A protein has these predicted regions:
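N-terminal binding-site loop/beta-alpha segment at the start of enzyme catalytic domains
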Residues: 1-15
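Solvent-exposed, non-membrane alpha-helical residues enriched in polar/charged side chains
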Residues: 5, 9, 43, 47-50, ...
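Non-cysteine beta-strand/loop elements that form the S-adenosyl-L-methionine
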Residues: 14-20, 139-143
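N-terminal small/glycine-rich loop or linker at the start of catalytic domains
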Residues: 18-33, 57, 62
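Active-site mouth loops of central-metabolism enzymes
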Residues: 28-43, 68-69
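Short, acidic/polar
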Residues: 37-53, 98-104
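Active-site groove signature of glycoside hydrolases
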Residues: 50-69
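Beta/alpha (TIM)-barrel catalytic core signal, keyed to glycine-rich beta->alpha loops juxtaposed to Asp/Glu
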Residues: 66-254
Length: 255
C-alpha cells in the first residue's frame, strides 16, 4: 500500500484504488498473524490503509474472507456502509469464490464488485451469471493461473521453499507437491496456439480470453518485474479474443 500510494499520489483523481481487509498483518515482520472482521478492526484497518496509501478515501474496500458465513457478514457490511457514509470508502466488495456469497453481497447497495478466481483453464460460469445479472464488476484473481499461463513452467519446474506454490496447500489446485500439475499443463498445451495467435504471448492470450469472457471482467495479474508489467499492458493493444476463438477454446477444454 505504501508503494502504491506513493506511485499514484500525483494521479489520484485519475485512478481507482482497491485494497483488502480481514487479515491481521504485522507491518514490522510483514507476517499475517490472524483474521479479524469485527467492526472495531475493520475501522482500524481502514484507517491504517488510508495512512499507508496516503489518501483520503479508498475507492473499493474488499472483504478478504471468502469462507465467512452469510450469517456473520451482515455486521461486516453494516460497518462498511458506515465507512461509505463517512466518506472513508466509496464502495465495497467480497473476495469469494462461493456463488451464493456473491449473490448475497449483491443485495447491498454499496457492493459494486466480486473478486473471484477466473482464468481460461478454470471458468466460473455460475459466478459470471450472478455478476452480470447484478451489474457488478468481475475482478479476476489468478488470471494467469499463478504463473502457469505465462508459459514459464513445465512439469519438472520446482519452486523456492519460500514460494507459496511450493507449500502444497489444499487450495493450491494448479500445483501438486510443489510442482505444476500435469492436468493443468495439458489443458494449456491444448489451447496454446489459439491464445498465442496474432503475435500474443501466452500471458497476453490469457488476458485476452478474460476480456472476451464478459464485459464485466477486470483481470488483476500479479507482476514482479517491469518486463511483466509491459507484457501485461501490451495485451490491451491486441484486444480481446474473437467469439470464434472463444468457441474453439470452449470446445477443446470441454472435450
Amino acid at each position: 500500500e505504501q508503494v502504491v500510494g506513493k506511485a499514484l499520489k500525483p494521479y489520484r483523481q485519475d485512478v481507482v484504488i482497491a485494497t483488502k481487509f480481514s487479515n491481521v498483518f504485522d507491518e514490522e515482520t510483514r507476517q499475517i498473524t490472524g483474521n479479524d472482521v469485527s467492526p472495531e478492526y475493520i475501522r482500524a484497518a481502514c484507517e491504517a490503509s488510508l495512512r499507508r496509501l496516503d489518501t483520503d478515501y479508498i475507492d473499493l474496500y474488499q472483504l478478504h474472507n471468502g469462507g465467512l458465513p452469510t450469517d456473520d457478514v451482515d455486521a461486516v457490511f453494516d460497518t462498511l456502509d458506515d465507512l461509505v457514509t463517512q466518506g472513508k470508502i466509496r464502495a465495497y466488495a467480497w473476495s469469494t469464490d462461493t456463488v451464493d456469497h456473491a449473490a448475497y453481497s449483491a443485495t447491498r447497495d454499496h457492493v459494486i464488485a466480486v473478486q473471484h478466481r477466473l482464468n481460461v483453464i478454470e471458468d466460473a460460469p455460475d459466478m459470471i451469471n450472478v455478476i452480470e445479472s447484478n451489474d457488478l464488476a468481475s475482478i479476476n484473481r489468478s488470471p494467469l493461473g499463478m504463473g502457469l499461463l505465462t508459459g514459464k513452467y513445465s512439469a519438472g519446474s520446482t519452486f523456492d521453499a519460500k514460494d507459496i506454490r511450493a507449500s502444497n496447500q489444499e487450495w493450491m489446485a494448479y500445483f501438486t507437491d510443489g510442482k505444476p500439475s500435469a492436468r493443468w499443463l495439458d489443458k494449456i498445451a491444448s489451447i496454446r496456439d489459439i491464445l498465442t495467435s496474432e503475435g500474443r504471448t501466452l500471458a497476453q492470450g490469457a488476458l485476452a480470453w478474460l476480456w472476451a469472457r464478459s464485459e464485466n471482467t477486470i483481470p488483476i495479474p500479479g507482476i514482479r518485474t517491469i518486463e511483466q508489467l509491459e507484457e501485461n499492458a501490451g495485451a490491451m493493444e491486441k484486444g480481446a479474443l474473437t467469439s470464434v476463438q472463444m468457441t474453439e477454446i470452449q470446445s477443446i477444454l470441454s472435450s
